[in-house]
Curated annotation (Swiss-Prot):
This is UPF0280 protein MK0206. Coiled coil: none annotated. It comes from the Archaea. Gene3D superfamilies: ApbE-like domains. HAMAP family: UPF0280 (MF_01079). Belongs to the UPF0280 family.
Length: 241
């Protein structure tokens, strides 16, 4: 596969695709949508700080509208979907097979089977040891109360969500992770799963919630595979092709 890394301030995207043209198309889309979002939030600063759903202003760019729509059903602010939305739009601009990894929030469009590995935290026994086998179109996004740059009110080691669109997976992961606070890890995982159950089979396909020794699954995630060849580097979710 061909690959390229695009870094624009907080946006750190790795693109992998079967052709140079697909990589180039995705990279151009990342730059375009990041630039349009920067210009938009300069006019609508409340869009960045909102912790609840907000509507976009008239004339908002596609990326801002996508973020707003994705966040609304989960009751979170639009920035909860920013990484997934940019990954989704970049992958949409390319021909399969393409994998766009925006800081661990991943959009896959694959004509063949690919594996996305799970990163939890450096000291967690599952981290880098398992992956998910994916074919077709799928977004895979993770939120954590332990690592990463994104805001989370939860204490989960990782909440990984699978949805056809990465924008939805990203917003859902944030919302589910926010419910994993409290001193009782088992109760926190159960509470998060009950929330996820309201969306699985509809807006999302599955969610995996990990806090300490407690792991719970809502819905039907992709096939889980063992990564025996070594650990992946810390990037939340990392394409292992």
């Amino acid at each position: 596969m061909y690959s390229m890394r695009v870094v624009i301030e907080e946006t750190d995207v790795t693109i992998r695709a079967d052709s140079k043209e697909s990589v180039s198309s995705a990279a151009k889309a990342v730059k375009l949508h990041r630039s349009e979002l920067d210009r938009y939030v300069a006019k609508d600063p409340a869009f960045v700080t909102a912790k609840v759903p907000v509507r976009t202003l008239e004339g908002a760019p596609e990326v801002a509208k996508l973020m707003s729509r994705a966040a609304e059903p989960f009751g979170v602010g639009p920035m909860a979907a920013v990484a997934g939305a940019i990954a989704e739009l970049a992958a949409r601009a390319s021909e399969p097979t393409v994998i766009v990894d925006n800081g661990g929030d991943v959009q896959v469009r694959a004509r063949r089977s690919v594996v996305v590995g799970l990163y939890v935290s450096d000291d967690h026994p599952l981290s880098g040891r398992i992956g998910f086998e994916i074919e077709g179109v799928l977004g895979v996004c993770t939120s954590s109360g332990k690592f990463g740059h994104s805001y989370s009110a939860g204490k989960a080691d990782a909440v990984t969500v699978f949805a056809e669109r990465a924008s939805l997976a990203d917003a859902a992961a944030t919302a589910i992770c926010n419910l994993t606070s409290g001193d009782d890890p088992e109760a926190a995982v159960q509470r998060a799963l009950e929330f996820a159950d309201d969306f699985t089979g509809d807006l999302i396909e599955a969610a995996v919630v990990i806090r300490g020794d407690f792991v719970g699954i809502s819905g039907r995630p992709p096939k889980i595979v063992s990564l025996r060849g070594g650990r992946i580097k810390p990037a939340r979710l990392e394409p292992t092709i």
